[in-house]
UniProtKB/Swiss-Prot annotation:
The Tol-Pal system is composed of five core proteins: the inner membrane proteins TolA, TolQ and TolR, the periplasmic protein TolB and the outer membrane protein Pal. They form a network linking the inner and outer membranes and the peptidoglycan layer. Belongs to the TolB family. It comes from the Bacteria. HAMAP family: TolB. This is Tol-Pal system protein TolB. GO terms for biological process: cell division; protein import. It is found in: Periplasm. SUPFAM superfamilies: TolB, N-terminal domain, Tricorn protease N-terminal domain. Part of the Tol-Pal system, which plays a role in outer membrane invagination during cell division and is important for maintaining outer membrane integrity. GO terms for cellular component: periplasmic space. Keywords: Cell cycle, Cell division, Periplasm, Signal. Residues 1-22 form the signal peptide.
């Protein structure tokens, strides 16, 4: 199933401005019942009115969406302490909760917010009654081994939600040993048939908040891809009656034309160091993979022959590419070594496999797999060859992996409209990101901020 490319003409370039339409909002569909219980205590606000951002709610939502944690509802909490000294450890362990996040927010004289928060090991706190004894310089002293995190920060009002995501990352890493991906962004294309500019390239926080309109066009926009530093997006637009590849600086609002060869220009993908761009051209006939050096402008052809080769994705070490090819009759995923152009087929299970991406550690291949059940997101262990179908949604496409490798965002069809969905890399947790003002396609998960 190769991508179908449509013709376009006019494009309008916008500043990186916020849009007023309904934002994406995650809806949990599966996976929470088996997750680890955790207490995210409502942060105490020692100020007038309401806190502009409900920090504890953001943290709870982040951890819930990871699929690994199940925050306790506030109504079921035995208490709501704002520091570890106030915790009733027995009450929490009786609920099966082994970790708590507590916090307090105040406002300083400059009008900024002072956020104090703690991550507490409840089990260890119960065993030591909140205090343990250890040796320091040969003397017995009280320690706080149960206090896993104890941080303080001064935050501007406009940064409160961002800092809440940062807290989520800290908590997630402390409890799992893996880096969190909550302070990240996604890019995607929205198709709003009721708009004068129906094709829109947007960027948002991973959870759909702080959505920004980057670009709008009367003609199709496709295949957004992030630069490694998160400052640029490569994408395909249809100007001058053909597909063209551009790179846009999302902060400056400037863009550069990268390729405009006859016929097809598509599937741009930055190299891990950001110095090159893998792309697909058909200037010699069939679709072929090329690499363009963004500094020297040198173009190197990687694949050749009569078959169509497309959807290139870089190996994390930058030494090879995976790509989709129909050289065997149906689309399957291959790997090409850039040193000698040797090629190996990777996928064998399913009549078709396409849209492949690699997890950051290079261990797993995530792709669209076609079987008797349709087109679904699947994961293949590149060491063992084992394949796991991750989704049960309809007509899945365009998977994109979180920078920590823990989640996959993709496009699917629900109620006859394209929308974005999330699935954990183990397939146990699923969520949907519905939108009310258009079809959402071609998601791309950005790098760590």
């Amino acid at each position: 199933m190769m991508k179908r490319w449509m013709m376009g003409l006019c494009i309008a370039l916008l500043s990186f401005s916020q849009i007023a339409q309904a934002e994406l909002e995650l809806v949990i569909t599966e996976g929470i019942d088996s997750a680890r219980p955790i207490g995210i205590i409502p942060f105490t606000w020692e100020g007038e009115g309401k806190l502009p951002t409900d920090i504890s709610s953001v943290i709870a939502s982040d951890l819930q969406r990871s699929g690994k944690f199940s925050p306790i509802a506030t109504s079921k909490m035995p208490q709501t302490p704002d520091s570890e000294e106030q915790i009733d450890y027995r009450a929490w362990t009786a609920m099966g909760v082994d970790a708590l996040v507590t916090g307090k927010v105040t406002k300083n004289a400059e009008g900024n917010y002072v956020v104090n928060y703690q991550l507490v090991d409840v089990v260890r706190g119960q065993l030591t009654s909140g205090e343990s004894r250890g040796l320091a310089n040969g003397e017995l002293v009280l320690t706080k081994d149960h206090l896993l995190v104890n941080n303080r920060a001064i935050v501007k009002e406009t940064r409160l939600r961002q800092y809440a995501h940062r807290i989520s990352d800290v908590v997630y890493e402390a409890l799992t040993g893996e880096q969190g991906a909550f302070l990240t962004r996604i890019a995607y294309v929205v198709i709003d048939d009721k708009s004068k500019h129906p094709y829109q390239l947007r960027v948002a926080d991973y959870d759909g908040f702080n959505e920004r309109l980057v670009l709008k066009s009367r003609q199709p926009l496709m295949s957004p891809a992030w630069s490694p530093d998160g400052s640029k997006l490569a994408y395909v637009s249809f100007e001058n009656q053909q597909a063209q590849i551009y790179i846009m600086d999302i902060y400056k609002g400037t863009r550069e034309l990268v390729t405009s060869y006859p016929r097809h220009n598509g599937s741009p993908r930055f190299s891990p160091d950001g110095k090159k761009l893998a792309l697909v051209l058909s200037k010699t006939g069939s679709l072929q993979i090329y690499i363009k050096d963004l500094k020297t402008k040198k173009l190197t052809q990687i694949t050749s022959g009569r078959a169509n080769n497309t959807e290139a994705f870089w190996d994390p070490d930058g030494k090879s590419l995976i790509f989709t090819s129909d050289r065997g009759g149906q689309p399957q995923i291959y790997r090409v070594n850039l040193a000698d152009n040797s090629t190996k087929r990777l996928t064998w299970q399913g009549s078709q496999n396409l849209g492949g991406q690699l997890t950051p550690d290079g261990r797993y291949l995530v792709m669209v797999n076609r079987s008797d059940t349709g087109f679904n997101i699947a994961k293949q262990d590149l060491k063992t060859g084992a394949v796991q179908i991750l989704t049960k949604t309809f007509l899945d496409e365009s998977p994109s992996i979180a920078p920590n490798g823990g989640m996959v965002i993709y496009s699917s069809v629900n109620n006859k409209s394209n929308e974005l969905s999330l699935v954990s890399i183990d397939g146990r947790f699923k969520a949907r990101l519905p939108t009310t003002n258009g079809r959402v396609r071609a998601p791309s998960w950005g790098p760590f901020l």
